[in-house]
From Swiss-Prot:
Tagged with keyword Signal: no
Annotated InterPro entries: AAA+_ATPase, ATPase_AAA_core, ATPase_T6SS_ClpV1, Clp_ATPase_C, Clp_N_dom_sf, Clp_R_dom, ClpA/B, ClpA/B_CS1
CDD domains the UniProt entry points to: AAA, RecA-like_ClpB_Hsp104-like
The keyword Repeat is annotated on this UniProt entry: yes
Source species of the chain: Yersinia enterocolitica
Region listing for Repeat 1, in residue ranges: 12-77
Compartment annotation: Cytoplasm
Region NBD1, residue ranges: 171-369
Protein name: Chaperone protein ClpB
Keywords: ATP-binding, Chaperone, Coiled coil, Cytoplasm, Nucleotide-binding, Repeat, Stress response
Gene3D superfamilies reported for this sequence: 1.10.8.60, Clp, N-terminal domain, P-loop containing nucleotide triphosphate hydrolases
Ranges for domain Clp R: 9-150
GO terms, molecular function: ATP binding; ATP hydrolysis activity
Length: 890
């Protein structure tokens, strides 16, 4: 009968066991694949005292030569292994021969390092291995050592040591297993490389999963098949593929599954752990095969969940060699192993779909991003866990704001993942604010310290006659101002903290009270009154910007989105109805001289927002027709800012780049087999990432007719199929198409304002011109809005607007106020021909003739006193810039 390792290693005394334990650690650190004799001898030699050292000293072995031999032997070992495969054959042989010598020759009950050395000198195979490491050991006479062993080692600490298996601390663990330097052989592969989701569900360690009943039911249908019973969950990162599997585990534990699935164990495979340390060819595949064999042989039915299943394709080696997916195929096809896979759609197309044999063994189950209502329900299921973790109260308005704002302003991620991250961050911010100083107070403290540092430097310079009295006085005033503001803010923060702490405690007591089967009504009313009083006190000491929040609300959510995106909080919290109602006013402020066009645009968008338009179509599809420079692009910018929170939500496509028919693929994405497949299209990817946006198709008349036809599905159904077969949703976008078709006709019609036609007449006159470029089917799907040539009053207004913008820059940069005469405005308008370039010529003229004069004035008189008036005038055909005598009072 073979001797077990447990019994063999248990006979080592404490010195030898510690030595081989540290030898396994050194072996792993050096990257050696096996624990060798050299590791053990090296560690024994570096111990403070033992039999080995007494024997070496007794026989006068050259210590320097012995240590050089150890170092050289270690250097000769192969390196590069990420884990230890096992103990070498020589280790086990040496222990076995040492035990024979100790028990039979020395009548001892444990193995000492001296016994180990005797065994290595006695056995010819071990002797060769020892002398290869340390040739100096040949000087030790075997007979002398054997006969005088007890005398030579009488002072060794090993004399009084017992065998390891005689210690109450010994549990049969092999050397290296306790420190994880070497993997134990007794651990089941299935338990080592998987996590039991059903066990976690029983222990309450999985959060509730809501809103995925359809996906779970479909997955159960697939799992109950006799063959090819393997669902493959595909969907964008963050839509909740893993949560669907966790929902299945919860349903199994809750007894909501049919009998065939009621007793199964749902195990998730850790692919990273499976591949970690698999340095030798075939080791990864061997581990995976052991997992599959144990799963199929398990007495309890097992369903294996492989997240990121595409990592198994090619994971075991290069393409065509040892592909781990090939190990899965037979078991999956025969139905012996039920497997749930999960991967993103792009990874599925890139890796799995290319292997038809693997693809047909899975049934693809698409997990789509939930709508806003479903996502809110999902967050409600997570609310108790978040409240318990952070110790805060989450209002329902915070859940709605997290979903709505993340859906609109964080388009790069998916619901519910981004809403959960947003809500989790909000909870953390509210919890932290109760213990750390607010950002405003920290900023004031920093500014005060910065000013104090500069003041100290100036005071030092003053001793050397280099003082700056004005700067010193300014810094002293700044420090005093910041200190006063910081003290005031500190007091308010402390007061808010105390009240919020009291409110939180009262809410906790009140919640525990009402949770009782028969709550005390009198106490409930008492605590409710106390809570109302505390909240009223908090409102009294607060300003518009609270320093400490008593709960997670919509304002906290909006502040975090503002930090992440840079969009103003007010614009995010503004509801859609108010944004639509303010749209006409916003457009009139930015787009000058187009009242009829703006009214028509506003009315159409209002109709769509009221739900009266076809819900399958985009919010609006408008073709803005007119000369260049009359406000078409500015209209798109104004709508993006008013309706979608900022100009960053404007997607601009220059259609002059799509004059050939083959350029259609760059808009929607290349089809399979073509260069660029899988990278997405310019338009489809932009809308997929920003579903709430204005899409500006500039100079649409220059695009190829095939490109025009591409948009028919967008105009009719509000969606476009990209090159990968995904449908991109355009229902929340506003499409603006700009065109210069009919510009000359419009200029002629409005050459004389008295004979200009009305709006219907303009459209009738434009129709023949448009039909020369666009087919009737295209024009029938868009709303044509003519943009008229700008009149004199509109041009003057535009000039004043641009000069006012220059004045704003002057005020912010130099604290100077800009004024200008009417002569300047009239001169700019009279000198610019706007027939072909529109308002762009006016702006270019101002930037070429007026702005340089202001710039030279600033550089020449750079020490001009702040708060003065800079006046621009036209004198003798030349623009002049001067300072008025009067000064603006703050």
């Amino acid at each position: 009968m073979a001797i077990t390792r447990k019994n063999l290693f248990g006979k080592l005394d404490a010195t030898l066991f510690k030595g081989i334990e540290s030898a396994t650690t050194i072996c792993k650190l050096r990257g050696n694949p096996y624990v060798e004799l050299i590791h053990w001898l090296n560690q024994l030699w570096h111990q403070e005292d033992n039999d080995l050292k007494h024997i070496v000293r007794y026989f006068a072995v050259d210590v320097d030569a012995f240590e050089r031999g150890l170092a050289q032997a270690l250097a000769r070992l192969p390196v590069g292994a990420t884990s230890i495969s096992d103990f070498s054959y020589h280790i086990e042989l040496a222990i076995e021969r040492a035990w024979v010598y100790a028990s039979l020759e020395c009548l001892d009950t444990r193995i000492r390092s001296g016994h180990l050395l005797l065994a290595m000198l006695t056995n010819m195979e071990l002797r060769r291995a020892l002398l290869a490491i340390a040739p100096e050991m040949e000087k030790i006479p075997l007979e002398h050592l054997s006969s005088d062993f007890n005398f030579i080692t009488q002072a060794s600490p090993e004399t009084n040591e017992a065998a390891t298996d005689g210690s109450p601390m010994y549990d049969g663990t092999l050397p290296g297993e306790a420190s994880n330097a070497i993997n134990g052989k007794s651990t089941a592969t299935l338990a080592q490389y998987t996590t039991d989701l059903t066990a976690l569900a029983r222990e309450g360690k999985i959060d509730p999963v809501l809103g995925r009943n359809h996906e779970i039911s479909t997955m159960v249908d697939i799992l109950l098949r006799r063959r090819q019973n393997n669902p493959l969950l595909t969907g964008e990162a963050g839509v909740g593929k893993t949560a669907v599997v966790e929902g299945l585990a919860l349903a199994i534990v809750a007894g909501e599954m049919p009998p065939a699935l009621s007793q199964v164990s749902l195990l998730t495979l850790d692919v990273v752990a499976l591949s970690a340390g698999a340095s030798m060819k075939g080791e990864f595949e061997a581990r995976l095969k052991n997992v599959l064999d144990e799963a199929m042989a398990s007495p309890t039915p097992v369903i294996l969940f492989i997240d990121e299943v595409h990592t198994l394709v090619g994971a075991g080696g290069n393409a065509g060699t040892g592909d781990a997916a090939n190990l899965l195929k037979p078991a999956l096809a025969r139905g012996q192993l039920r497997t749930i896979g999960a991967t993103t759609w792009s990874e599925f197309k890139r890796h799995i779909e290319k292997d038809p044999a693997l693809t047909r063994r899975f049934q693809v189950l698409q997990v789509d991003e939930p709508d806003e209502d479903t996502a809110i329900s999902m967050l409600r299921g997570l609310t108790p866990a978040l409240e318990k973790h952070h110790g805060v109260w989450i209002m329902d308005e915070a859940l709605q704001a997290a979903v709505r704002l993340s859906h609109r302003y964080i388009p790069a991620r998916q619901l519910p993942d981004k809403a959960i991250s947003l809500l989790d961050t909000a909870c953390a911010r509210v919890a932290v604010a109760q213990f750390s100083q607010p950002a405003e107070l920290q900023q004031l403290t920093f500014q005060s310290e910065t000013a104090q540092t500069e003041l100290s430097s100036l005071e030092k310079a003053q001793h050397f006659g280099k003082g700056q009295d004005e700067r010193t006085a300014l810094l002293e005033a700044t420090i005093a101002q910041h200190s006063a503001a910081a003290n005031k803010l500190e007091q308010r923060w402390q007061a808010e903290r105390e009240l919020v702490t009291a409110i939180t405690a009262t809410r906790t007591v009140l919640y525990e009270l009402v949770s009782q089967p028969t709550p005390d009504e009198e106490k409930r009313q008492q605590y409710q009154q106390q809570l109302a009083q505390l909240e009223e006190q908090l409102l009294l000491i607060r300003s518009a910007q609270p320093l400490v929040q008593a709960e997670v609300n919509a304002t906290v959510i909006a502040n975090i989105v503002a930090d992440w995106t840079g969009i103003q909080v007010g614009q995010m919290l503004k509801d859609d109805i108010r944004a639509v109602m303010e749209l006409p006013q916003r457009l009139e402020e930015r787009v000058i001289g187009q009242p009829h066009a703006l009214v028509q645009l506003s009315e159409n968008i209002m109709t769509a927002r009221a739900g009266m338009a076809d819900p399958r179509k985009p919010l609006g599809v408008f073709m803005l027709v007119g000369p260049s420079g009359v406000g078409k692009t500015e209209t798109a910018l104004a709508i993006a800012e008013s309706m979608y929170g900022g100009e960053q939500n404007l997607i601009t496509i220059n259609m002059s780049e799509y004059q050939e028919s083959h350029t259609v693929s760059s808009l929607k994405g290349s089809p399979p087999g073509y260069v660029g497949y899988g990278e997405g299209g310019v338009l489809t990817e932009a809308v997929r990432r920003k579903p709430y946006s204005v899409v500006l198709l500039d100079e649409i008349e220059k695009a190829h007719s095939d490109v025009h036809e591409l948009f028919f599905q967008v105009f009719d159904k509000g969606q476009m199929e990209d090159g990968e077969g995904r449908f991109i949703d355009f229902k929340n976008t506003i499409l603006l198409l700009t065109s210069n078709v009919g510009s000359e006709l419009l200029s002629n019609l409005f050459a004389d304002p008295d004979t200009a036609p009305d709006q219907d007449g303009i459209l009738s006159a434009l129709q023949p011109e448009l039909l020369k470029v666009f087919p009737a089917a295209f024009l029938g799907r868009v709303t044509v809005i003519p943009y008229l040539p700008l009149q004199q009053s509109a041009l003057q207004h535009i000039v004043r607007l641009h000069l006012d913008r220059i004045g704003q820059r002057l005020q912010s940069q130099h604290q100077l106020t800009l004024q200008y005469s009417d002569v300047v405005v009239d001169d700019v308008v009279s000198r610019c021909s706007v027939a072909e370039t529109g308002a762009r010529m006016l702006i270019r003229y101002i930037e070429q003739n007026i702005t340089p004069e202001i710039g030279k004035f600033i550089l020449r008189d750079h020490d001009a006193i702040p708060n003065q008036i800079v006046f621009v005038d036209k004198v003798e055909n030349k623009f002049t810039v001067s300072v008025l005598n009067e000064k603006i009072n703050n």
